Amino acid sequence: MKYIEVDEELYRLIASKTERIGESASEILRRLLGLEVEASATQEKDEPEVISQPGLEETADVEDKPRFIDLHSSINKEELAAAKGAVGRFLFILEAVYLASPEQFAQVLKIKGRDRLYFATSKQSLLKASKSANPKEIGQSGYWVTTNNNTAKKRTILTEVLHQYGTVEAQIESITRNI
């Protein structure tokens, strides 16, 4: 497998042409260009595909109730608006969450999909889990997040993070709408 860099516009175009969860960029491009798609990627499975739902796959261990932090006031609206694209806003909000309570942030490592790792403490861990993860560091936190998810999935992941911080539902909706 070779890696190429594409600009944001091409990335969004390719991502918008996704027809099924887990479809790789190579599969999308092959389909769009009319090339033969690898048989193993498109074969029907005996069992229906399970869609990843962060926070629903694993039951969390019983732990102390997270202390409430008003994250809404921690997010600078002007800086958020200046963030580049959905990925930039996603990273900006995650960094604000980290800065609000760094000692609590390690909880995000528990947020995983069925066969998907969303957070890690190294870029290599995310790339090992998925070659197409496109990991980005969350500010200077030392935590990394997968960014090759669509905006809806980013919102779902962020919702789970905010739940771990004890954020109230109204604030969660308000914050995640900003991605």
Swiss-Prot record:
> What would you give as a GO molecular function for this chain, any one?
DNA binding
Q: Where in the cell is it found?
A: Cytoplasm
Listed under GO cellular component are: cytoplasm
Cite the residue spans of the region called Interaction with DNA.
86-87
Alphabetically sorted, this entry's keywords are: Cytoplasm, DNA replication inhibitor, DNA-binding
Record carries keyword DNA-binding:
yes
Q: Which GO terms describe its biological process?
A: negative regulation of DNA-templated DNA replication initiation; regulation of DNA-templated transcription
Protein family according to the UniProt entry: Belongs to the SeqA family.
Subunit note: Homodimer. Polymerizes to form helical filaments.
Quote the function comment for this protein. Answer: Negative regulator of replication initiation, which contributes to regulation of DNA replication and ensures that replication initiation occurs exactly once per chromosome per cell cycle. Binds to pairs of hemimethylated GATC sequences in the oriC region, thus preventing assembly of replication proteins and re-initiation at newly replicated origins. Repression is relieved when the region becomes fully methylated.
Protein name from the UniProt record: Negative modulator of initiation of replication
